[in-house]
A protein has these predicted regions:
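Juxtamembrane/disordered regions of integral membrane proteins
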Residues: 7-10, 14, 21, 28, ...
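Alpha-helical transmembrane segments and their lipid-water interface positions
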Residues: 18, 76-80, 107-115
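Membrane-embedded alpha-helical segments of transport systems
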Residues: 70-75, 100-104
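Interfacial aromatic-anchored transmembrane helix boundaries in multi-pass membrane proteins
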Residues: 21-50, 61, 83-88
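Hydrophobic transmembrane alpha-helices
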Residues: 1-6
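Hydrophobic alpha-helical transmembrane segments of multi-pass membrane proteins
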Residues: 35-39, 66-67, 94-102
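Short helix-perturbing small/polar motifs within transmembrane alpha-helices
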Residues: 10, 18, 38-74
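Alpha-helical transmembrane segments and their cytosolic interface
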Residues: 91-134
Length: 134
């Protein structure tokens, strides 16, 4: 939710810094593998967020949230494939894709509750949030 908030309400640079800080936190608290997988997932989800915002039409917050969650899990799968083997990483794909759908849906529901209140307190610095309907 934090990176999605930064992409929508701040700017892409802030979102990138958050991805890097989250990966650094994972590295320091859970080790090199967790830091690497966090970076892979965060980078791919940020890239997907940016691509979705570049579309010439408005998309729903649900699609935005679920796409980010699925991209995050796919990024982690790619990172795991690079560290382990493709076959080992692929065995986790169905579980992570289902988890991405569930977590993305939950993220959407929480965002739908939080973002309108945040908009009233802190006006968006980015026009990106106008491309997503929550």
């Amino acid at each position: 939710i934090v990176v999605m908030y930064a992409v929508l309400f701040l700017n892409r640079r802030s979102a990138l810094y958050l991805v890097l800080l989250k990966a650094l936190f994972a590295l320091l608290t859970r080790g090199v593998t967790a830091g690497f997988l966090s970076l892979c997932g965060g980078a791919l989800s940020l890239a997907v967020f940016c691509l979705l915002l570049a579309l010439p039409f408005t998309i729903t917050g649900y699609i935005f949230s679920v796409s980010g969650a699925l991209a995050h899990n796919c990024g982690q799968l790619l990172g795991a494939a690079a560290l382990l083997s493709d076959k080992m990483a692929i065995t986790y794909a169905p579980i992570l894709l289902i988890a991405g759908l569930i977590v993305g849906s939950c993220t959407y529901m929480v965002s739908r509750l939080i973002f309108p209140a945040v908009k009233r307190i802190i006006p968006p610095k980015s026009k990106a949030e106008s491309k997503i309907t929550f």
